[in-house]
Every structure is written in structure tokens, then in C-alpha cells.
């Protein structure tokens, strides 16, 4: 019973982290947070194309299909579009 409780708790924590990351923020707060998180920006990375401000590894259209989406935590967190073509 204890293992099931830990599994459910860990799933809920993961789900809440994804929801918090994808939640819409006011534009002023988002731009402030965006400028703080850009300290590691380099010339090989760029902003997403289209209406989205951040890329998503599950949405190829965000990076125009031929660019690769890289995130700090694999699928979320400070996602950036890379100029490297996707493999496969």
C-alpha cells in the first residue's frame, strides 16, 4: 500500500510541474522571467517561430519542423529551438 501511495504522489508532483510550466503568465511577468532565464543563450539557439514563446518537444510546428527543440529537463523547462536538424 505504501508503494502505491508513493507512486501516486510522484505522479501528481510530475503532473503539477508540467502544468505549472505550461500555465500562461501575464506578459510583463513572462518577459521578466524570460530575460532572467536567458543567461545561457548562445548563437546556436533561437526563439520559436510562430505564436508560441517557448518550444515543446511534442509539437514539431513550434520549431518549424526542421529545427530541434531542447529543454533543460528533457521535455520541459527553458525550452529553446536549436538550428540542428532533427534526426530521423
UniProtKB/Swiss-Prot annotation:
Expressed by the venom gland. The keyword Disulfide bond applies. Residues 1-17 form the signal peptide. It comes from the Eukaryota. It is found in: Secreted. Keywords: Disulfide bond, Ion channel impairing toxin, Secreted, Signal, Toxin. One of its GO terms (molecular function) is toxin activity. Disulfide bonds join 48-63, 55-69, 62-81, 71-79. Residues 18-47 form a propeptide. GO terms for cellular component: extracellular region. The presence of a 'disulfide through disulfide knot' structurally defines this protein as a knottin. Weak insecticidal toxin with probable ion channel impairing activity. In vivo, induces paralysis when injected into sheep blowflies (L.cuprina). Shows weak toxicity, since it is only toxic at high doses, and flies recover within 24 hours. Belongs to the neurotoxin 07 (Beta/delta-agtx) family. 02 (aga-3) subfamily. This is U18-hexatoxin-Hi1a.
Amino acid at each position: 500500500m505504501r508503494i502505491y501511495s508513493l507512486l501516486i504522489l510522484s505522479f501528481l508532483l510530475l503532473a503539477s510541474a508540467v502544468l505549472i510550466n505550461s500555465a500562461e503568465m501575464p506578459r510583463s511577468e513572462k518577459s521578466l522571467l524570460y530575460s532572467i532565464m536567458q543567461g545561457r543563450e548562445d548563437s546556436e539557439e533561437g526563439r520559436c517561430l510562430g505564436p508560441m514563446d517557448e518550444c515543446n518537444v511534442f509539437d514539431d510546428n513550434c520549431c518549424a519542423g526542421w529545427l530541434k527543440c531542447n529543454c533543460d529537463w528533457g521535455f520541459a523547462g527553458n525550452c529553446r529551438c536549436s538550428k540542428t536538424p532533427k534526426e530521423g
